Regions:
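Catalytic, metal-anchored helix/loop core of enzyme active sites in primary metabolism
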Residues: 72-74, 82-85, 89, 192, ...
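Structured alpha-helical segments in the cores of large, soluble enzyme domains
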Residues: 1-5, 95-98, 223-226
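Conserved anion/nucleotide-ligand pocket segment
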Residues: 59-123, 128
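Conserved active-site and cofactor/substrate-binding residues in soluble primary-metabolism enzymes
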Residues: 28, 51, 55, 90-97, ...
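Glycine-enriched alpha-helix->loop->beta-strand junction motifs that scaffold or abut catalytic
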Residues: 12-14, 79
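Substrate-binding/catalytic subdomain of NAD(P)-dependent oxidoreductase enzymes
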Residues: 97-216
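General beta-strand structural signal in soluble alpha/beta enzymes
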Residues: 15-18, 44-48, 72-75, 238
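Rossmann-fold NAD(P)-binding glycine/threonine-rich loop
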Residues: 2-11, 20-47, 52-63
Length: 247
């Protein structure tokens, strides 16, 4: 449907969308859309692209357009994966059991591999990078796929019947985590963010101190830390519900 965005704007329509496609496909389209919006004095509202109902994108826009130098954005972008690893880190239950609970609770996509592959988090991170006028493409995002190689192909039904194959892999990761840490699946926009070539976009499973802001997250909450030149090592933190029917 995004191919209709330009003619819609040209014919006098504002745009409102929860869909991420227009903000994550090739940068030439992204740039052309914004030039067209400016030319026709129209708005494109997409706050829910990242962070569900949290006021994240608007906050980043306001900071950036005010001249504040944003130096890093780090956070838990997926409410689904937040629930998985928050629960897993605090429980003795096997990973497959917690994943099944997430499926039953409606936290995941119909095929949970859409959440577990990490691409959705990668797209969200890319959207934030582009808000800082970086011209990165999706292919430049480094994404850790959480799905064991043997389970990435095949039908949804076959995948759901083999969830126990996750257990030894994630038990080993959990056992190897340093004491006093918990597992979190984190998106991290860092490096020199003043230019596209030096910006780094990483999405991966990491161990964080249990006492940190990311380590304290509960349930299916999302959390975002926005580091700026003015605030130094004390980031602006935005946190709230990241998954579930209500959001």
């Amino acid at each position: 449907f995004v191919e209709n965005y330009l003619p819609l704007v040209e014919n006098g329509f504002d745009l409102v969308s929860a869909n991420k496609i227009a903000n994550t496909i090739g940068y030439p389209f992204y740039k052309k859309l914004r030039e067209t919006l400016a030319q026709y004095k129209k708005q494109y509202l997409y706050e829910t692209n990242v962070g569900a109902g949290l006021p994240l994108i608007d906050t980043i826009k306001l900071l950036h357009h005010s001249g504040e130098n944003i130096t890093r954005i780090k956070g838990i972008f997926s409410g689904t994966l937040s629930f998985l690893f928050n629960t897993y880190s605090a429980s003795d239950a096997p990973f497959s059991e917690i994943l099944q609970k997430a499926i039953n609770s409606g936290y995941t996509e119909p095929d949970p591999r859409e959440d577990l592959c990490g691409n959705d988090v990668g797209r969200k991170l890319l959207i934030l990078a582009r808000e800082l006028d970086l011209e990165n493409e999706f292919e430049e995002v480094t994404i850790e796929n959480l799905i064991p190689e043997a389970l990435r192909q095949g039908s949804r039904e076959e995948f759901l019947s083999r969830l126990k194959e996750f257990d030894p892999i994630y038990q080993q990761i959990k056992d190897n985590a340093p004491a006093g840490t918990v597992l979190r699946y984190v998106g991290d926009l860092h490096g020199d963010l003043s230019q596209t070539a030096t910006a780094r976009l990483d999405v991966k499973l990491v161990s964080v101190p249990v006492t940190s802001a990311l380590g304290q997250v509960k349930g299916a909450d999302s959390i975002f830390e926005i580091y700026t030149e003015s605030y130094g090592e004390n980031p602006i933190v935005i946190q709230g519900a990241g998954a579930g029917a209500a959001v």
